[in-house]
């Protein structure tokens, strides 16, 4: 389930949700609608009783979502930093704090000069129906190389090491047989007795400090030395980790590549790639996806694109079905 509710209570709207209306009370008559199409704001964000109305609205949808979720299912609630803390508490109440999975921060804009700190991230609060049996698939992104990253050195076929910037930080400019790498620590953060030993590299003897050990045993270290992967350091040796060894890395809970997307149809529409990652992490082809806050239909579009079944709905009176 992917929910993209209104972010807060501060924006104006043509339609006001009332939570204390009396039976048969008529509100929002058709004749009250403005004649100017641009004044009809479908994506409303205003509440009669302020935060109380907002949380009551969201809690109703979360309670229903909990009943609809499969035991291996997940729910993602998109929100800004204004009400992130309130939404997290609400999800704790409805789904149980034990089923909290993560808060994902994804970049939406570039800082444009604000009085205080610019807010350039929105958030997705992820909960499982049951964390013990939640469906999850790790996603990977290409590792970055060049200036500003750890992969900033090149080993030439002649075994000489030069900065990657000498090749304009472009893999296409590298000569055949060259490799991009970074130096990583050979000392483990803990202590493993079988990995405590001395070894010699070009006549220099190395031994881990007291209470520490190497990240591999003696036979593993010997293989690394034969492969010319062990490098001299000022005090301790390091390991030459080449970009080609594992050219991808797992996505964590901070997504920076979501800013600047050109697939938006209106200002508050969620980028395809944000919903795409959530779906690919937690569903398989043929699984059913629900979005009770359909809006522009981005969730349905992404679900259809990746072979998921989908249901969407919208409470706006100007929604088109």
Model segments located where?
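Class I SAM-dependent methyltransferase "Motif I" SAM/SAH-binding loop
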Residues: 293-297
């Amino acid at each position: 389930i992917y929910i993209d509710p209104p972010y807060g209570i501060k924006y104006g709207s043509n339609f006001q949700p009332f939570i204390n209306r009396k039976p048969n009370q008529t509100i929002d008559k058709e004749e009250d609608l403005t004649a100017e199409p641009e004044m009809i704001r479908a994506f409303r964000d205003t509440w009669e009783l302020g935060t109380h109305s907002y949380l009551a609205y969201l809690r109703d949808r979360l309670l229903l979502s909990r009943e609809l979720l499969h035991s291996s299912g997940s729910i993602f609630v998109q929100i800004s930093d204004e009400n992130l803390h309130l939404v997290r508490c609400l999800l704790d109440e409805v789904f149980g704090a034990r089923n909290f999975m993560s808060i994902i921060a994804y970049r939406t804009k570039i800082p444009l000069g604000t009085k205080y700190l610019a807010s350039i991230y929105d958030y997705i609060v992820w909960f499982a129906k049951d964390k013990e049996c939640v469906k999850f698939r790790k996603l990977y992104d290409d590792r970055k190389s060049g200036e500003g990253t750890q992969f900033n050195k090149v080993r030439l076929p002649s075994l000489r090491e030069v900065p990657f910037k000498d090749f304009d930080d472009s893999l296409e400019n590298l000569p055949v047989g060259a490799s991009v790498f970074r130096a990583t620590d050979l000392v483990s953060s803990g202590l493993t007795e079988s990995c405590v030993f001395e070894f010699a590299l070009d006549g220099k003897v190395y031994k881990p400090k007291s209470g520490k050990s190497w990240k591999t045993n003696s036979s593993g270290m010997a293989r690394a030395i034969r492969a010319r992967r062990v490098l001299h350091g000022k005090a301790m040796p390091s390991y030459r980790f080449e970009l080609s060894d594992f050219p991808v890395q797992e996505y964590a809970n901070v997504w920076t590549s979501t800013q600047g997307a050109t697939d938006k149809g209106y200002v508050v529409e969620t980028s395809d790639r944000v919903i795409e990652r959530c779906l690919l992490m937690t569903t398989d082809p043929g699984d059913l996806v629900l979005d009770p806050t359909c809006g522009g239909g981005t969730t349905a579009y992404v679900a259809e694109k990746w072979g998921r079944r989908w249901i969407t709905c919208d409470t706006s009176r100007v929604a088109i079905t």
